[in-house]
Amino acid sequence: MFSRRYHIGRLYHEVYLCRRWEGNSDAALSQDRINKNNTYKDHLRTLEILARQQLNRSREQVPSPAEVEDFFQNEKKNWSDAAARYEALSGVQTKVLAEGQKLSTVNSQLSTLSAQWNPARMVSTGANISKQAIEKRPCFLCDSNRPAEQHALPVLGQYQLLINPFPILPKHFTIPTREHTPQTIKGHFQDLFKIARQMPDYMVFYNGPLCGASCPDHMHLQAGSRGIAPLERDWKSVYEPKLKPFAEGISILTDYACQVLVIRTENIAEAQKRFDYIYNLLPLHEGETEPRMNIVCWKDGEEVVTLVFPRAKHRPDCYFAQGDEQLLISPGALDMCGLLITPREQDFRKLTPEMAIDILREVSLTPTLSQGEGAKAF
């Protein structure tokens, strides 16, 4: 371990220089002794190379469920601030806005929606993501700017698994790239798919730059506990039977607060092909680098279910309203899945099923269908 942390040190020279030539202690030894010493050093070098190869292979993979659980518990044990927020999360107030058929009279939608009053999320909901604000603040996902207590678990070689210190879900992770690159799903969709497949206890999600990402200058995914967000929790019993064909290999969910495009497959290449179809179908807003969307994935049997939420707006009008008309809700992937996050108590108390549905519909992009068999336009 010493040689892996420091470039200069006794073990480093022992392992990597390996041979000791004229001018040092081996020069005075017999040839037989020198050969034995060199054999021993070569053996050390081989052990170190094999250990590094194994370490590199592990970094190229998704951590096992046991590794993720151990990491999560260790982070809470050693990071008191984060542990306190997870403890507080168990006591946050939630309320069911509507259940199943009760919403059938509200905008003709069959939905289950919930709200969570989570004051700690003000840091995200209230985030200023203007270009000027981003340029002025250090990136909190880069290694050099993270708290000393926050450690990382390598994922797929180019990502790091971090405990999210401002959780929404009982277990909540941020998965940033090791390099500081802008938030974009292009080139990262298959990684999202792989992580969801290898972390079956979690839903893995992506917030676009203007769709809930509080750090749009650094590419990151997120993962969190399953069985909490209503759309994922009730998928098999309520929503999956309601799917309709949209395009080849793609379904659409219309019996929900907003329309959702759905990909179900165990084949990663097929998933990429179907996602590319959706990606290329969505409009690109002027001055932006990718279509607006949220994506949520989870493993369902052998398949991975991928939900794509096309977005029209970053935040609803009520976010910018004044006085009693204001609702400080900035929808991300979890909000789109029916768990609306309200940092302020007054918004939590005031939010109704009708308001929640109106917010999700307002920020969503609704496709124009051609006889229910595909999209004409967005």
Name these PLM-found stretches.
Residues P176, D217-M219, L369:
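Single, functionally critical "micro-switch" positions that shape active/binding sites
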Residues G372-A375:
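A cross-taxon signal for low-complexity, glycine/charged-rich
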